Amino acid sequence: MAELDTIYETKIKYTGLFSFNDLYNLLYDFLTDYNYFVTEEGYTEKVRAEGKEIEVKWLCLKKVTDYFRYRIKITMRLFRLLEVEITKEGKKVKMNKGDLEIKFTAILERDYENKFEISPFHKFLRAVYEKYIIKNRIEQMEDKLVEETLTFVNNTKAYLELEAKK
């Protein structure tokens, strides 16, 4: 079985005006621009008296080498989501108002093709390979994964800050 190491985890919280559709598309486009394959693992929507509750779960995979793969899990949770109409630059625009929470979990997946799972001896070889031969390479992969995840997080924050200023 592939080795999964959670490298980085963070959460963004935001309350105010934003466009959920724009945010959804922005994140999706950004991930695909970085060559991630995005799978929506879940989407639930509940209508409550105070507004909608939505939860979206994505699994984003990026093959880096034959041995390493980046895995980013994103969970978007929205509470008290209401559709409101605002006037922006003299035009009426539909926006969303509510609470938003986005969780990013970056995971480095090693031996995702299970090439070292053939026998106990191969598993031992993988341990030696990782500990002595590619130790620095693993650290580089971890750093690059954190860097990419932070890019997604910072761009999401920048979008939300822009929406707040409008």
Regions found by a protein language model. Name each.
Residues 1-39, 44-46, 140-141:
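Terminal, regulation- and interaction-focused segments at domain boundaries
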Residues 13-19, 59-61, 77-79, 103-109, ...:
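Solvent-exposed residues in well-ordered beta-strands and their adjoining turns
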Residues 21, 25, 35, 96, ...:
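Detector for Asparagine
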Residues 7-11, 53, 99:
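Intrinsic-disorder/low-complexity, polar/charged segments enriched in Ser/Thr/Lys/Arg/Asp/Glu/Gln
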Residues 103-166:
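Glycine-rich, aromatic-bearing surface loops/beta-hairpins
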